[in-house]
């Protein structure tokens, strides 16, 4: 089972998507209760990035919590989150930078690094641009130091993108991106102890592939992000 921590709604979605079996949510819930099947509990997300101390550039919140998009590459969200792995009593960290498309909720590009620095964010952006030539989305982030860096703003301008930033300490302004972090960590990270960097990075890479290509979402009409994306391209 790709995701043994699925709740009854996701189990029902998989039955519809993979096996064309249509049953009521309540029936699946009764079966899950009878078999003691439970989803992973939801943890609070405390990963909101703080405002840069000396921002070189600050953009207005042009997105303004309008998380609807009519086509791919219309609106991109981005953020950085951290993970820990353990070597005996020593705690190590890795950082994941990712860009999410609001139309199909696919992860457009991502980079994992030992350092939370400008190159991490710049490399993620460069990968997204390379994979989507000609894309000119509204590009939304929080006010972390990488995104308020003037060099990064110039990279956005050169790519023909408009920059948007969340208000200070308003994580909900970047809600779907924060939501993706929560999904990833709830399904693959929390309640686990990683004892090597390779194991942790493999988990992240495998999960992003699973999320894009195998994990259906009701908000996408019980499709995966890539199915939603490809349907638009084929229309």
At which residue positions do the language-model features occur?
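Mobile genetic element proteins and their domesticated derivatives, centered on retroelements
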Residues: 11, 28, 32, 63, ...
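Conserved, non-catalytic sequence blocks in retroelement Pol enzymes and Pol-derived host proteins
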Residues: 4-5, 20, 67-68, 86, ...
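An active-site-proximal beta-strand-loop segment
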Residues: 65-108
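Active-site beta-loop-alpha junctions of metal-dependent nucleic acid enzymes
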Residues: 92, 111-132
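Basic, flexible linker segments flanking DNA-binding modules
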Residues: 1-71, 170, 226-230
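C-terminal domain-tail junction helix/linker
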Residues: 157-161, 183-235
